[in-house]
């Protein structure tokens, strides 16, 4: 009897489903079936060997082809992103092997055959032609998706089900399409207005990537419906002014005052360039939801603001929402050269799942203009994509053609839903171009003459989309012209109003958090402050931090350490640094203030001195004595060993302190001279933020053995 005769009697759809499961999660398949599929794959891969040919041909031909169609589907999932229509101004690079039928043991003659493998994608049994057409629309159109490296079956299943709905194509109503056009028009018209009114001035325009504006707008509206109340964003200079005006609601009047270069209202501030300033506002969405909008100030040093944003988001989560990650949404907008070339994105991504630094997932959007100042993308990275850092945390990546506005919004909403469901990072690679040079006074044809000839003739995304909606009879050419005119007229009014202003006003970022806290003058900084506390309170703290739980077993060395501390306080007049430090934290906690300390090995302390967090010997249960002073009526003490990073962690803690003026936030360098691993944070934020941005911060830095 043929050893595979049982396959003839079985339903091929069942085997197709099982083989698909095997290809995605081999260990989830019953061992005997896994061995069968491994044998089949081995036979296919080694089909030049006579024994392998025999083992494959013993499987019924109809089932062989069914399996090969499953392999084709799997290949589209894994490699379809390499063959997309995502680049508006360049031809795609060629990748091999491609998705041709012959690479899967199939031929054009099989196109009219019906395969049960269509069930895998939710389209039911279908001809190979229909299956391929569906796969092309899902994986090789304006959106390319990387996700098959994800190891969680639930996430894989969710992604695949979402992708196969409506062929992964947008399905917006007429009103939604008109709204996308409106936001695109704002983005395009804003840049055109600035280009006309402020000829040659640096603005780092968004031209070529204007679809970022409807994407961000869609995220804010949809996030509010998810329950998000705080939107925290970081981005560099490219497109920042456009985003400030058309997403965050900063008035054109304020922007134009900054362009006119007027003196600042307060002479004690040096200020900064207009595309570095932060902004905080309140927005009411179309559904009447209230959301606080925050875009953090940033320096010219690319990617630094990402770490700060993570810290701000974490602080808001803890301070206002009891850790509910559905209430705060962090978004970081990157440049393609920066996210690939700077080390900080890697450090930030590595933080995402750590207990002291997680924020419930970040949406990363790359405004990919395929050039870093003058450097071609082929010289800017070794990886295939600028977003390959996403694979560190197995985060999905959506590569999108920025000329396809609906695809951009569709992909962004997908990213938001993924983040809200799974609490994980997700990346969007927005492939566009840069209409001018790095800034508006730069000549890009020195280094990319061929590309810029093409860009000069290329329609902007608004005009492309307007033509589509006109063809669909959703708007008329007159409607589009009126949209443009109305927005331009509103900017003219703002410009006229700005000319009446004599001074430029810097509005402090997150001013509400710092309400009631004044900026300290030099004289105030030198005032002696009475920090004494009541002896009774100090004794209560000392008793708590020198008393181990009686029902726990600890190492003898820990028992001795705690005993020595008890004797220090109660039997002598001398105390070491660690005891003094813990007493200081304890009195603050007793008064209701939160304390956070993070850095490398800070829980125990690099020199085995702190032991702020103790481990029970047998269970390794974590004991924090400082949180047991008055459990129902005290501040929270948080101590976190950080990843081995200085740059990102100090940036994170700086952001945390920025959003927590009434807490003591400490970053400790492992050794004092290790602090220079975070030098940019010292130079651009800690030492300069107040002077540049009117931004206050209470970060405390400990430098053991520092100079």
Where do the language-model regions lie?
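Active-site pocket-lining segments that scaffold enzyme catalytic pockets across diverse folds
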Residues: 189, 193-253, 563, 575-589, ...
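Alpha-helix capping and helix-loop boundary segments enriched in small/acidic/polar residues
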Residues: 6-9, 60, 203-210, 292-303, ...
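Conserved phosphate-handling catalytic cores of large alpha/beta enzymes
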Residues: 372-383, 391-427, 432-437, 445
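Cofactor-binding active-site loop characterized by glycine-rich and histidine/acidic residues
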Residues: 229-394, 398, 607-660
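Glycine- and acidic
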Residues: 1-4, 15-19, 195-207, 229-230, ...
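Extended, charge-enriched "interface" segments that sit outside catalytic cores
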Residues: 40-212, 228
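Subset of Sec-pathway N-terminal targeting signals
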Residues: 1-40, 44
């Amino acid at each position: 009897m043929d050893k595979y005769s049982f396959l003839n009697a079985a339903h091929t759809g069942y085997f197709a489903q099982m083989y698909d499961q095997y290809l995605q999660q081999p260990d989830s398949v019953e061992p005997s079936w896994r061995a069968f599929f491994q044998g089949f794959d081995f036979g296919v891969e080694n089909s030049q060997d006579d024994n392998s040919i025999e083992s494959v041909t013993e499987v019924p031909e109809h089932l062989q082809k069914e399996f090969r169609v499953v392999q084709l589907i799997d290949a589209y999932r894994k490699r379809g992103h390499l063959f997309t229509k995502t680049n508006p101004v360049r031809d795609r690079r060629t990748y091999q092997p491609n998705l041709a039928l012959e690479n899967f043991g199939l031929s054009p003659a099989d196109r009219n055959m019906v395969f049960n493998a269509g069930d895998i994608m939710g389209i039911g049994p279908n001809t190979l032609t229909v299956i391929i057409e569906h796969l092309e629309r899902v994986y090789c159109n304006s959106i390319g998706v990387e996700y098959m490296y994800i190891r969680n079956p639930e996430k894989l299943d969710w992604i695949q089900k979402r992708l196969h709905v409506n062929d992964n194509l947008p399905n917006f109503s007429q009103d939604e399409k008109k709204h996308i056009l409106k936001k695109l028009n704002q983005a395009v018209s804003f840049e055109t207005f600035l280009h006309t009114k402020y000829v040659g001035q640096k603005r780092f325009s968004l031209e070529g990537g204007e679809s970022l504006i409807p994407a961000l707008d869609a995220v804010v509206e949809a996030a509010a419906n998810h329950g998000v109340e705080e939107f925290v964003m970081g981005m560099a200079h490219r497109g920042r002014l456009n985003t400030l005006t058309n997403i965050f609601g900063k008035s054109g009047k304020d922007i134009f005052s900054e362009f006119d270069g007027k003196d600042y209202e307060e002479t004690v501030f040096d200020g900064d360039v207009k595309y570095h300033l932060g902004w905080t506002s309140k927005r009411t969405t179309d559904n009447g939801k209230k959301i606080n909008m925050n875009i953090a100030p940033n320096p010219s040093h690319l990617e630094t603001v990402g770490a700060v944003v993570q810290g701000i988001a974490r602080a808001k989560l803890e301070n206002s929402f009891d850790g509910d990650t559905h209430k705060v949404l962090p978004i970081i907008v990157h440049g393609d050269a920066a996210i690939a070339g700077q080390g900080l994105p890697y450090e930030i991504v590595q933080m995402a799942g750590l207990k002291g630094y997680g924020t419930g997932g970040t949406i990363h959007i790359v405004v990919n203009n395929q050039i870093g100042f003058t450097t071609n993308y082929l010289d800017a990275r070794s990886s295939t994509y600028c977003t390959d850092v996403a694979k560190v945390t197995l985060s999905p990546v959506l590569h999108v053609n920025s000329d396809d506005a609906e695809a951009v919004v569709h992909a962004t909403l997908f990213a938001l839903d993924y983040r809200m469901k799974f609490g994980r990072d997700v990346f969007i690679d927005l492939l566009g171009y840069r209409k001018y040079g790095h800034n508006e006074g730069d000549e890009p044809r020195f280094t990319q003459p061929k590309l810029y000839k093409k860009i000069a003739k290329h329609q902007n995304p608004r005009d492309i989309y307007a033509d589509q909606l006109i063809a669909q009879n959703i708007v008329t050419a007159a409607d589009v012209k009126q949209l443009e005119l109305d927005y331009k007229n509103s900017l003219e009014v703002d410009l006229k109003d700005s000319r009446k202003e004599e001074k430029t006003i810097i509005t402090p970022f997150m001013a509400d958090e710092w309400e009631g806290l004044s900026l300290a003058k030099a004289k105030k900084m030198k005032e002696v402050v009475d920090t004494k506390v009541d002896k009774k309170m100090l004794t209560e703290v000392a008793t708590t931090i020198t008393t181990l739980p009686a029902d726990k077993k600890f190492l003898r060395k820990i028992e001795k350490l705690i005993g020595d501390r008890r004797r220090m306080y109660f039997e002598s007049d001398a105390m070491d640094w660690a005891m003094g430090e813990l007493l200081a934290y304890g009195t603050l906690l007793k008064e209701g203030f939160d304390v956070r300390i993070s850095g490398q090995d800070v829980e125990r302390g690099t020199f085995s001195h702190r032991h702020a967090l103790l481990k029970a010997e047998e269970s390794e249960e974590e004991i924090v004595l400082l949180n047991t002073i008055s459990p129902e009526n005290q501040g929270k003490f948080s101590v976190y060993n950080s990843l081995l990073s200085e740059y990102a962690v100090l940036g994170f803690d700086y952001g945390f302190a920025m959003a927590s003026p009434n807490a003591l936030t400490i970053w400790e360098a492992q050794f004092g001279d290790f602090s220079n691993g975070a030098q940019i944070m010292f130079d651009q934020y800690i030492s300069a933020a107040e002077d540049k941005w009117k931004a206050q911060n209470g970060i405390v830095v400990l430098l053991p053995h520092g100079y």
